[in-house]
Amino acid sequence: MGPVSTSRRGLRLGISLILLQVGVVGACTVSVLQPGYLEVDYTSQTVTMECTFSTTGCPAVQPKSLWFRCGTHQPEALCLDGCRNEADKFTVKETLDQNRVSLTVNRLSPNDSAIYICGIAFPNEPVPTAKQTGDGTTLVVRERLFSREVHSLLIVLLALLAVYVTGVCVIFIVLFRSKSNTPRSRETKEDSKKKSARRIFQEIAQELYHKRYVETSHQPEQDGNYENRKALPSPGRP
């Protein structure tokens, strides 16, 4: 942060010298505000940087706005002629009654990356505070990494990937539910088989018990008949 702040101070000193040429140093206070950073894609074609200011103790006259660009070279004054034509590289729009000015960079290219500084000056005021600059807006113009065709293709691929992932999730859920239901069905079948086997076993046991009961009930009757036959005299014997 040290070297950057030092370089910016040097830039502001150099720009202040340019502002001093606009009017004699001498009575009001101006404060200038700018966004510190702005990053755009060069395919945007245009970019606008805003600058707002406030005044204290200054006369009721319109101040003069100036723009400077600081790149790899010395500070460069922009739009000294006003830059009112939108066909130009730079276009300045002033709304001084609202304390607002803006600079639009047309036909963007990566070479437009620089620090753009807004300056507001009351030329007829003798004090240095009547001529002030903002801290500057660092504009970064990025080259587009992909063409429109590649960008569209990536969107389509992402959509297909989303559909594929959704389908896989649905299949996984269905398989998981079917597997969780299979053991239950198997248990139900095994339980029914066990119940039917128990029922058959009980029926066989009841049948055997019934037969045994019938046999045991007939056995005393047969024994009684046999004894009665022995007790009876045989015919033909005196």
UniProtKB/Swiss-Prot annotation:
Compartment list: Membrane
Cysteine pairings via disulfide bonds: 51-118
Keyword hit for Transmembrane: yes
Cited InterPro entries: Ig-like_dom, Ig-like_dom_sf, Ig-like_fold, Ig_sub, Ig_V-set, IGSF6
Domain of life: Eukaryota
Residue stretches of biased makeup (Basic and acidic residues): 215-230
TM spans (from-to): 154-174
One Gene Ontology cellular component annotation held by this UniProt entry: membrane
Limits of the Ig-like C2-type domain: 30-134
Cytoplasmic side: 175-238
Keywords tagged on the record: Disulfide bond, Immunoglobulin domain, Membrane, Signal, Transmembrane, Transmembrane helix
Record flagged with keyword Metal-binding: no
Extracellular topological domain residue ranges: 28-153
Region (Disordered) location: 215-238
Signal sequence range: 1-27
Bilayer topology term: Single-pass type I membrane protein
Residue ranges the record marks as coiled coil: none
Gene3D superfamilies xrefs: Immunoglobulins (2.60.40.10)
More about this protein: This gene is coded entirely within the intron of Mettl9 which is transcribed in the opposite strand of the DNA.
Name the UniProt record assigns to this protein: Immunoglobulin superfamily member 6
Lineage summary: Eukaryota, Metazoa, Chordata, Craniata, Vertebrata
